[in-house]
Amino acid sequence: RPALAARAPDSVQSPPVAPGRKLVGVVLYPGFEVLDVFGPVEMWAYVPDFQVVMISQDGGAVRSAQGVSTLSDYSFASSPQLDIMMVPGGIGTQTELNNNAMLDFIRKQNEKTQLTTSVCTGSALLAKAGILKGHKATSNKNFFSLATSQDPSVDWQGKARWVEDGKFITSSGVSAGTDMA
């Protein structure tokens, strides 16, 4: 059987957190947008002081909106504290807006992150979690009303490609996440 046809494992051994490196965690969920995740990951992979990990509610494989599965390094329960958290967008955002485990994880991690970031409709999840109150933020222009309806106390910026406000960096549609990173 060719190596490329080999079945991927259902789980991976979580990598140890390397001392002195910033831990960048990407929060995956069913229906995430591939480019929202892997555009920024490509940029962060070149930063020598960054260690990038994938996190999902239950760990294991998570299927994207494009049908490609990605293995999580950690579940919400096993995740270490992140220095930088990134929440991508995707069609699955609409389901996750009602997922208390997701919203609780975002709130808990955000308490101690140095940066909390999002791509596309990921900002809707940050807003729904209540962590963007009083901050400037943006989202995908095609789904802007989805994000803005989650928390009207956010200072939503409709024309921005990305917005930095304190420790929050939000970006609009897919490729803007690469620019943000």
Model-found features: residue ranges?
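Extended, subdomain-level signal for the structured scaffold at the beginning of enzyme domains
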Residues: 1-116, 123-128, 133-134, 144-159, ...
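A short glycine-/small-residue-rich loop at the edge of a beta-strand within enzyme catalytic domains
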Residues: 93, 138, 172
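Conserved SAM-binding loop
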Residues: 116-118, 170
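FMN-binding flavodoxin-like domain, especially the glycine-rich phosphate-binding loop
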Residues: 138, 158-164
